[in-house]
Amino acid sequence: MIYLDDAATSKPLPSVINELLHYLDDKWGNPSSPTSISYLPDGMIGCARAEIADYIGANPYEIFFTSGGSESNCWAIQGYINHQTRINRIPYIVASTIEHHSINACLENLNARFDYTPVDRFGRIDLNELELRIHDLSSYYSGCCPLVTIQLANNEIGTVQDIRSISSIVHRYNGILHVDAVQAFGKMHINVRELGIDMMSVSGHKFGCPKGIGFLYIRDGIKISPLIYGSQQRGMRGGTENVPYIAAMRKAVSLLRKDTAYDIRMNVLRNNCIARLREMGFTINGDPNHHLPNIISATLHQDIMADNLIYMMDTCGVYISAGAACNSSSIHPSHVLKAICMDDVDAYRTIRISLPFDISMDEIDMAMDLMKQQIQILLSEKA
């Protein structure tokens, strides 16, 4: 098996699984209980907060554990809307045209005004257009405190946004910046203070944790309402804490600290993969200068649909995708590819390769050899 779909989900790391099982088997107390069996789980949660906060340049009390990226995204948006409504302000949200489906679905199903700001053909946000939208709504809605929600790195094409500049624009108009860092976390350095991030969503299963754990960073002073009510986590996120999964995420973050050569290693592998893809007639999508090192979006300019190539590769034990896993069953072309001005035909011919941290050069070469063979087979069937 050669797994090249890491952006969909990463394989849980052995040491992370061991940590999870340890807390399932031996330290299973309820952290909210006054009994002695609960002391260790409660203490571990505090240590996990401190470890994560230190990794992103935050304070421990600014970290709130959730079930994952989608919950964190929805909480940031709905919590903002509910709080603004409660204090008699008009909630207004600006997002880019290439956001994750959890953001788009949230905007389209909640009672709030929102607008989309465009991206260029590389998937980079037009900063002038963004400022124009924020300026216009701030002028029209007096006292408006807009929420701008932006992916740090896109999950389909890997483009990384200039969050520092976006933050400067947002704060110039007294807005709040929420960043979806689900794909970026663990793949690039993130310091929320340096970047000027007010809220940030993260999901554990993108960096070696099991599915079902994540967190929302909320900068001290940012006011949003809870999404799930209860007494836990200072009343901000109810529900008994998922102790084993929090322990697993703490372990995964500690491992990220140790992998100091990730960028160098992954860029070498990425460049080799891209060279092989270009030899087969693919063009590469996304920003050539500002991108994650592990995501490659590639369009084949031959009469082969991505779904057919994905199926053929699957039968060979090589796993790739056509884009976001959360939208893999859609019959419509990717909204991300449409946003970067790709036509429907090319969108249906686009694949995504995302490299796990432990992939080898030999595995990439083997996968590319198999892909070349499968493309030739598919073309011969059409002849």
Task: Set out the residue ranges of the language-model regions.
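Pyridoxal 5′-phosphate
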Residues: M1-A383
